[in-house]
Amino acid sequence: MTTSIAGLESLGRVHFIGIGGVGMSAVARIMVSRGVPVSGSDVKDLPVMRDLSSAGARIAVGYDAGNLGDAQTIVAGSAIRADNPELVAAREAGLPVLHRSEALAATMAGHRVVTVAGTHGKSTTTSMVAVLLKEAGLDPSFAIGANVPALGVNAAHGSSDIFVAEADESDGSFLNYRPLIAVVTNVEADHLDHYGTPEAVFASFDDFAALLPAQGVLLACSDDAGARALADRTASKGTTRVLTYGTSDDADIRLHDGGPGDVSVALDGGVHKLELQVPGRHNALNAAAAFAVAVELGVEPGAAAAALGHFTGASRRFELKGRGRGVRVYDDYAHHPTEVRAALSAARSVAGDNKVHVLFQPHLFSRTREFSQEFAAALDLADTALVLDIYPAREDPIPGVTSTLITDHLVNGRLVSADEAVDAVAAVASEGDVVLTVGAGDVTAYGPVIVEALGG
């Protein structure tokens, strides 16, 4: 196959530093599908790297300047440090170095682009849109920050002119896209390590909405104060269309959420029942957004509603890891207080009259410092909250910032060490209960071990 998409042919051979990451592998997968010569490396030998190798990419495990080979363009992941030997060699050679979002934007050229942004719910909503459109026969290209069982992959090159992508606001890179349809699920203060102030976060979303053309549309959640304010500000400018979705009476796409089995959307006088396989009000709202996108792209409303029934979830988004001793164990990527609250609310709806136990791993020292009391309030929705040490990710420790900032405010929880965590969870869980591992770090690895400890 030869590259025929404008913006890709000028890149030449592309080398990805950190190709195993879910976002980086998504872009690499699409480029390989379009015939772009791709190579890449990562510090660990991850399953996705073997998939990419089988598809034709040249893959190396470990970082070494020699891995660049004859690359003409470099794509570096956000987690790649400035002293990475491949990045150092690329800069010394004068090679262009692209952010992942810039590389993804190049693959979008010539498409009708749908981007999904928001502080929470991006991956799930993007996944819902992609599954819905595929089931409706539109076969979009897509790039998602999570693996999606109903799609089999986190990214693919489709046959239509539609491209669906998750737009990450964490470092401002969502401003590199040029959407026709932009979904904003919610807007809250987060990633203050990058933005500095909540006002700067809100301003970045204004800039994002301003990217829409006159014939485009902003789809904003009316149930969220930040997204609703963004919709109002954007509408007042008159530069693009604005539609809202949610449970509020004045939403353009009205959601009714009476709990499992009683979810529907109303549009233009018609009411369409949604058969959702994922629990929680947040997922009902995400489904309403996906429905709105599909209708904007010409899918008949009834067909759009029916297609949502094929969505079974995304990896690390309230994902069932197994059962043991009558206890169901789920895993969720939630790493902001609002997300933790939504995940635990979903767990409550699944548990019924039984108990909910959460093993939480805070993500980033800066986020823990900013939201410690909010995390505690959210975690107290559980009957038992066990909190691990902070997962640092890209950050260096901040003096005085530890998980005790959270546990000091908990009513039903305490700090646990990595060594005691599994036994502590197993000791409190009884038949019918729900266990939830929560966080954006390596807490996900505890799920299968907990299932095993429960005899599953």
UniProtKB/Swiss-Prot annotation:
Catalytic activity as recorded in UniProt: UDP-N-acetyl-alpha-D-muramate + L-alanine + ATP = UDP-N-acetyl-alpha-D-muramoyl-L-alanine + ADP + phosphate + H(+)
Gene Ontology molecular-function annotations: ATP binding; UDP-N-acetylmuramate-L-alanine ligase activity
Keywords from the named record: ATP-binding, Cell cycle, Cell division, Cell shape, Cell wall biogenesis/degradation, Cytoplasm, Ligase, Nucleotide-binding, Peptidoglycan synthesis
Name assigned to this protein: UDP-N-acetylmuramate--L-alanine ligase
Pfam families: Mur_ligase, Mur_ligase_C, Mur_ligase_M
InterPro entries: Mur-like_cat_sf, Mur_ligase_C, Mur_ligase_C_dom_sf, Mur_ligase_cen, Mur_ligase_N, MurCDEF_pg_biosynth, UDP-N-AcMur_Ala_ligase_MurC
Gene Ontology biological process terms in this record: cell division; cell wall organization; peptidoglycan biosynthetic process; regulation of cell shape
Subcellular locations according to the entry: Cytoplasm
Family: Belongs to the MurCDEF family.
Binding sites annotated in the UniProt record for ATP: 118-124
Enzyme class, UniProt record, top EC level: ligase
